């Protein structure tokens, strides 16, 4: 991983355009090729990014120290004009073991993958643990119309889980082979605040009955 702290301005050119004026920012270049731009006030969410597969070319320009052009397979560009570099270091982190879900969440994922029709009539499973640049999506499915659906599974659904699914959706919807991608937030319990946030973002909520999925007597699934 390469860490660069620099005064820079950023332009995203593609299906959408976005501009970040000059400011001090953290630039992350990961081993998978992804590039992300971070400020000091947004916890974990980058200001902008380019997901792999993408390619970074560093060039020189007259009015700045460097110009980074990051291009993805769709031809979209993330153009980072660097006015001054304050820090530049590279670090080998090795292979990360990844986040280990607790037993119930892992079993819920397995059961829901086996009974994907729980999500709705006509649903089919594309893949469990669909890998993205920011982590694996629990389930990637297709609905009855053939549209992509990302499913995040929790034992207890809270706002953090909705934020996590939101990040996945933002990333997946940049892939022209998958877009448009909708989301389902599935959990045994979903807190009211999480439900409100999910609904506001167009994410469907599904309350899971663990015992019913395991084949024992219980109540029906509730969709809302």
Swiss-Prot record:
Subcellular location, principal: cytoplasm
Name of the molecule in the record: Endonuclease NucS
EC number(s): the record gives: 3.1.-.-
UniProt function note: Cleaves both 3' and 5' ssDNA extremities of branched DNA structures.
Q: Which organism is it from?
A: Rhodococcus jostii (strain RHA1)
Q: What broad class of enzyme is this?
A: hydrolase
Q: Name one GO molecular function term.
A: DNA binding
Q: Which UniProt keywords apply?
A: Cytoplasm, DNA-binding, Endonuclease, Hydrolase, Nuclease
Q: Does the keyword Cytoplasm apply?
A: yes
GO terms under cellular component: cytoplasm
Gene label: nucS
Q: What Gene3D superfamilies does the annotation carry?
A: 2.70.180.20, 3.40.1350.10
**Record's subcellular location:** Cytoplasm
InterPro entries this protein is in?
Endonuclease_NucS, NucS_C, NucS_N, NucS_N_sf, tRNA_endonuc-like_dom_sf
Q: Which family is this protein grouped under? A: Belongs to the NucS endonuclease family.
**Is NADP found in the keyword set?**
no
